[in-house]
Amino acid sequence: MKRILIVDDSKLMRDMVAACLRPLGAIAFEFAGTGLEAIERLALASFELMVLDLNMPDVGGVEVVEFVRAQDRLRALPILIVTTRGDDESRAHVLAAGASSFLAKPFAPAEILEQVRRLLAPAGAIGRAPA
């Protein structure tokens, strides 16, 4: 079973992201309401993906991305940034910090589902016909 860490200071947004991703099937969701809580969870467990809000009250999304990329064990973790800051400058900044992908709020459920499917796909599997 794949594990996804959803990090957002809004419980409503955490629940909405999880609901959007339920069609993926066998996924276990864990939640963090702050950047610091996300770092603590990452230290204790392994995840296949992190969906991360950019703006949080303690440790921001960019700082969490930088922390993850500095850890050997976590370096390859795909990180999808989900934020209200959808401008090109914010996108470029988080991708340069090491985020894997970026999605601006508000988004359609199909948009986040497609992004997560792409990030969870094995390398080289995108566009391949199923065996």
Where are the predicted features?
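Acidic, metal-coordinating helix/loop segments flanking the phosphotransfer/catalytic sites
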Residues: 31-49
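Receiver (REC) domain active-site loop signature in two-component systems and cognate sites
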Residues: 56
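C-terminal output helix
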Residues: 107-116
